[in-house]
UniProtKB/Swiss-Prot annotation:
Catalytic activity: L-alanine = D-alanine
Highest taxon of the lineage: Bacteria
Name of this protein: Alanine racemase
UniProt pathway: Amino-acid biosynthesis; D-alanine biosynthesis; D-alanine from L-alanine: step 1/1
Residue positions binding substrate: R130, M303
Family classification: Belongs to the alanine racemase family.
GO biological process, one term: D-alanine biosynthetic process
Active site per the UniProt annotation: K35 (proton acceptor), Y255 (proton acceptor)
Function summary: Catalyzes the interconversion of L-alanine and D-alanine. May also act on other amino acids.
Gene Ontology terms: cellular component: cytosol
The protein's required cofactors: pyridoxal 5'-phosphate
Species whose genome carries this gene: Shewanella sp. (strain W3-18-1)
A Pfam family of this chain: Ala_racemase_C
Record has Isomerase as a keyword: yes
């Protein structure tokens, strides 16, 4: 018997999405971003499905070590860099690249003793103002890195966009211009484009693109849908009806008696709640997919359950599957209704949700 709730992960969808992104950026290599447990899709699940990716981007050293332990041989890059000097021998031992974005990291690289140099991607703050060396610092920092024997040469170069998910916002052009002017003539790879860059800003694609959310079939742009770009949702979040009840007009349901039926109807109780990562703040009317149609959530989402209005003439029965988001109900639509972003929904599923390749 299949577990529920479960996140069914489609290997064919992941492979399709990688192919679509390659088509968008034919001259670029693809660093598939699989941080946050593969955006909730399962770190090794995703990496094993995307064996044709040229590399993988991660946020934590532990994620990179898990991939190496799982047999992944491709280039790995720590997008936030290393945090401690004791991380550096592990980078060497497991052939893991690191971003450098701060003075403290440079000092650790200059002081540590290593058996071979580390491959470094220097992050430039071209305008996001979160991580990276400023244009004023760049020449000095670059010279220090070039002089450091613990750093492999050439040094690679990167930046990150603040507003690429706003296709009409020309701040991305400003960032591209700043980065390109600063790094002109220097050797090494360049990477600028995240998912939005790859899809909407072709001039940003460079030597490597770093797609994240788009690999999972989701658009990075508000009001857009991944399917508009040929992407296929890789996750179907599925549970089931555990009760179907006749419900009288003017009767409430759930904690706080928040919702009251306007007419006689049939309610379905679905075995998923905020204890599984489904948002408690999902408002009345948020859709789920039952037997080929959208039906609305009614009442408050509780820890283990939520309630839906199946309609007066519903023939749904206990045991029927319920899709919370996926190929028949885009996660972008659900996120917009709830007032959040799809990234948050797919990455916040709790361990109670079984994640399995479909």
């Amino acid at each position: 018997m299949k577990p529920f709730p479960r996140a069914e992960i489609s290997s064919s969808a992941l492979q399709n999405n990688l192919a679509v992104l390659r088509q968008q950026a034919r001259a670029s290599q693809v660093m598939a971003v699989v941080k946050a447990n593969g955006y909730g899709h399962g770190l090794l699940n995703v990496a094993n499905c995307l064996v044709n990716a040229d590399g993988f981007g991660l946020a934590r050293l532990e994620e990179a070590l898990e991939l190496r332990a799982g047999g992944v041989k491709a280039r790995l890059l720590l997008l936030e860099g290393f945090f401690r000097s004791t991380d550096l021998p592990l980078l060497v031992a497991h052939d893991i690249d690191t971003v450098v974005h701060h003075e403290s990291q440079i000092e650790m690289l200059e002081q540590v003793k290593l058996t071979k140099p580390v491959t470094v991607w220097l992050k430039v703050d071209s305008g996001m103002h979160r991580l990276g060396v400023t244009p004023e610092q760049f020449a000095t920092v670059y010279a220090r890195l070039m002089a450091c024997p613990n750093i492999a040469k050439p040094i690679h170069l990167m930046t990150h966009f603040a507003c690429a998910d706003e296709p009409d916002n020309h701040y991305t052009d400003v960032q591209m211009a700043a980065f390109n002017e600063l790094t002109a003539g220097l050797p090494g790879f360049r990477t600028l484009a995240n998912s939005a860059g790859a899809l909407y800003w072709p001039k940003s694609q460079g030597d490597w693109i770093r797609p994240g959310i788009a690999l999972y079939g989701v658009s990075p742009v508000a009001g857009d849908c991944g399917t508009n770009h040929g992407l296929i949702p890789a996750m179907n979040l599925v549970s089931r009806l555990i009760a179907v009840r006749d419900h009288k007009a003017n009767q409430p349901v759930g904690y706080g008696c928040y919702w009251t039926a306007k007419q006689d109807t049939r309610l379905g109780v679905v075995a998923i709640g905020y204890g599984d990562g489904y948002p408690r703040n999902a408002p009345e009317g948020t859709p789920v997919w039952v037997n080929g149609r959208r039906v609305p959530i009614v009442g408050r989402v509780s820890m283990d359950m939520l309630t839906v209005d199946l309609g007066q003439d519903a023939t749904d029965k206990v045991g029927d599957d319920v899709l919370l988001w996926g190929q028949d109900l885009p996660v972008e639509e659900v996120a917009e209704r709830i007032g959040t972003i799809a990234y948050e929904l797919v990455t916040k599923l709790t361990p109670r949700v079984a994640v399995c390749l479909a």
